[in-house]
């Protein structure tokens, strides 16, 4: 068993798609549009086969994204080693996005940073623990 995909509603479908393409090497499928209900979406696929569905509806209610709440709180991407976390985090910061923590080693041993995407969704960027332990397997 595996998770097939995760979906999230966004206000600016194209900007979010570009964000994940630029920083996380996502490959977008064809845009789906259902004009009758004002819905559109992209499936983004990542190198390991994981997928994220970005969805937009013209009649959405966007509430503040509290960091301390129940429900899904972030998406985490493993990007390689610590140097990769540092490099990607720095690029995201230099491009004007907010870094809310790190890069740092957490109390439970993860090397990570946490950033906000264009719409304030929390994204963790982590080092692959297998690489950090000397394994060549991702």
Identify the role of each PLM range:
Residues 2-11, 42-45, 65-138:
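Vicinal oxygen chelate
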Residues 9-51:
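Core segments of cupin and vicinal oxygen chelate
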Residues 7, 58, 81, 119, ...:
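Short, flexible active-site-adjacent loop segments at beta-strand->alpha-helix junctions, enriched
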Residues 4, 29, 73, 100-101:
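A short, local hydrophobic-aromatic micro-motif
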Residues 12-25, 59-63, 89, 121-127:
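Short N-terminal helix-initiation segments at or just after the protein's N-terminus
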């Amino acid at each position: 068993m595996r998770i097939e995909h995760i979906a999230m509603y966004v206000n600016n479908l194209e900007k979010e798609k570009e964000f994940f393409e630029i920083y996380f090497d996502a490959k977008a499928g064809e845009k789906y549009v259902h004009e009758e209900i004002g819905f559109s979406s992209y499936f983004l696929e990542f190198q390991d086969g994981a997928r994220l569905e970005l969805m937009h509806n013209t009649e959405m209610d966007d509430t503040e994204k509290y960091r301390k709440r129940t429900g899904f709180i972030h998406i985490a991407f493993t990007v390689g080693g610590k140097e990769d976390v540092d490099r990607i985090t720095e690029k995201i910061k230099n491009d004007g996005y907010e870094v809310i923590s790190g890069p740092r080693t957490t109390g439970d041993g993860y090397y990570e940073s946490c950033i906000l995407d264009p719409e304030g969704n929390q994204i963790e960027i982590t080092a692959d623990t297998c690489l950090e332990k000397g394994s060549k397997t991702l």
